[in-house]
């Protein structure tokens, strides 16, 4: 990136110097063992740095230095007095290490204490920091240096020795100093990511340019979250994962730019109320939560994952999100079959349903009842169904092959082109669903039936062995026989049938 910027900056110079500079930097990068800048000459007191006829102002060299990766920038500062002064103003501080330890903390502390604090745009701890009483002092000190009116991105990942993230005791958590984001210091912040800490703003934070807020394993209340959102007018993405303490999430109407909302496993959460008018995608995975979506006319994409999600989607969504185009549903358990829908998903084009339990999906659930979902989606083009399980408990087609059911009223599907079923088994109701699709879809181009779990396969060349399918091997072979017996004869010549069978090399019974 620094090379490209340098080329642009030098475009006004003569062609000869441009070529020399480009070749110099390419050679320098190719020979790099310690730093891309080992060959750069030191500045000897002037405001011009030179190399082989390359004359650039000091501010351009400073800009080049700012575009280097943090490791290279630090090494350049070690061998060049000029770059050493630039190092104190390096804008992007990104720290990552596989095993953070005390030595890592000392290095970070040294780097930040030697930084001027001026011009920092990004501070990211991507690998996380183990938190204890002693590291609290360091974190406070580092944030005090880095969080200035110029900072645009802050990523603070904390690793806790306590694995019970839903404990009611928060004494051993790092308490993020919210005052650092007041008095204009957070005015340029665009992306804030906090994990495994407490975040308790008691005053309105000045985050008028914040576009993305991501909180994971953070202790914060609904009122405190509202305090953050009330001044985040530019917010576009809000992600709340495993945040304990929130009972109600209220999205105010002033968030005109909010287009993406994600809420997963916030266990105390009871209500999600949205008033943002332009919310386009919503992804959530919480059980027994009341959704007040308002007039979500702009919502095009929705995903949900919790027990009973299929039933809820059929009963509530068509009227609440009428313009939905992509719907993803995950449910480990359904108490009842899929009901007839009260109204239609007129614009739904892509439907993904995952009915995957811990061991086996409820044997009482009728896969054939999903027909009502398909019939309520006249614009549907793609349908993915995952029914992978450890043990098949449904009635097999070979145990009851008489009189396959058909719907009394035929709905012709003229837009559905691709259907894929992963974890395909010999369950009679699943065979009936597949036959219904073949009999009533005039536009179908591809039908994929995967009798494995749809995971790694040696046939792709990327893996040496296929992912084991364990006790489902016998059932997978039965599924192949069911396809050959009941489905292949129904496939029109215009439809491509792709069947993924157990691997003859990897999936062999011992």
Regions found by a protein language model. Give the residues of each.
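Leucine-rich repeat
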Residues: 2, 7, 39-247, 252, ...
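C-terminal capping region of solenoid repeat domains
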Residues: 2-47, 165, 381, 391-402, ...
């Amino acid at each position: 990136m620094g090379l490209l910027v340098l080329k642009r900056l030098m475009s006004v110079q003569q062609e000869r110097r441009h070529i020399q500079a480009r070749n110099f930097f390419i050679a320098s990068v190719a020979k790099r063992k310690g730093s891309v800048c080992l060959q750069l000459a030191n500045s000897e007191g002037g405001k011009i740095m030179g190399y082989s006829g390359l004359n650039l102002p000091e501010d351009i060299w400073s800009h080049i230095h700012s575009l280097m990766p943090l490791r290279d920038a630090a090494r350049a500062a070690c061998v060049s007095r000029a770059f050493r002064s630039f190092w104190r103003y390096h804008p992007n501080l990104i720290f990552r290490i596989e095993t953070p330890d005390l030595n890592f903390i000392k290095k970070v502390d040294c780097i930040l204490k030697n930084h001027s604090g001026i011009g920092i745009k990004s501070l990211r701890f991507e690998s996380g920091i183990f938190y204890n009483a002693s590291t609290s002092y360091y974190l406070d000190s580092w944030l005090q240096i880095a969080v200035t009116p110029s900072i645009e991105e802050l990523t603070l990942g904390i690793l806790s020795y306590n694995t019970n993230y839903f404990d009611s005791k928060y004494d051993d958590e790092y308490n993020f100093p919210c005052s650092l984001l007041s008095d204009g210091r957070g005015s340029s912040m665009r992306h804030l990511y906090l994990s495994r800490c407490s975040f308790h703003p008691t005053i309105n934070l000045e985050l008028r340019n914040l576009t993305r807020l991501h909180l994971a394993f953070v202790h914060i209340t609904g009122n405190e979250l509202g305090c953050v959102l009330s001044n985040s007018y530019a917010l576009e993405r809000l992600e709340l994962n495993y945040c304990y303490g929130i009972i109600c999430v209220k999205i105010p109407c002033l968030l005109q730019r909010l287009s993406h909302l994600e809420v997963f496993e916030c266990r105390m959460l009871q209500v999600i109320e949205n008033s943002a008018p332009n919310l386009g995608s919503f992804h959530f995975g919480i059980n027994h939560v009341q959704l007040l979506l308002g007039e979500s006319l702009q919502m095009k994409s929705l995903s949900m994952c919790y027990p009973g999600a299929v039933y809820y989607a059929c009963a509530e969504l068509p009227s609440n999100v009428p313009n939905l185009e992509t719907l993803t549903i995950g449910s480990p358990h359904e108490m009842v079959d899929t009901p007839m829908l009260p109204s239609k998903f007129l614009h739904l084009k892509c439907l993904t349903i995952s009915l995957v339990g811990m061991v086996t999906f409820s044997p009482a659930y009728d896969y054939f009842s999903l027909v009502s979902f398909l019939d309520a989606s006249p614009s549907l083009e793609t349908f993915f169904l995952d029914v992978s399980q450890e043990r098949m408990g449904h009635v097999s087609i070979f145990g009851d092959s008489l009189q396959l059911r058909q719907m009394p009223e035929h709905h012709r599907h003229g837009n559905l082109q691709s259907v894929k079923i992963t974890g395909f088994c010999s369950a009679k109701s699943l065979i009936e669903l597949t036959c219904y699709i073949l009999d009533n879809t005039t536009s179908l181009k591809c039908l994929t039936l995967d009798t494995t779990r749809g995971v790694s396969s040696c046939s792709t060349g990327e893996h040496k062995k296929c992912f084991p399918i364990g006790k489902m091997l016998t059932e997978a072979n039965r599924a192949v026989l069911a396809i050959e017996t009941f489905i292949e004869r129904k496939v029109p010549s215009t439809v491509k049938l792709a069947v993924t069978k157990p691997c003859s090399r990897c999936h062999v019974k011992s």
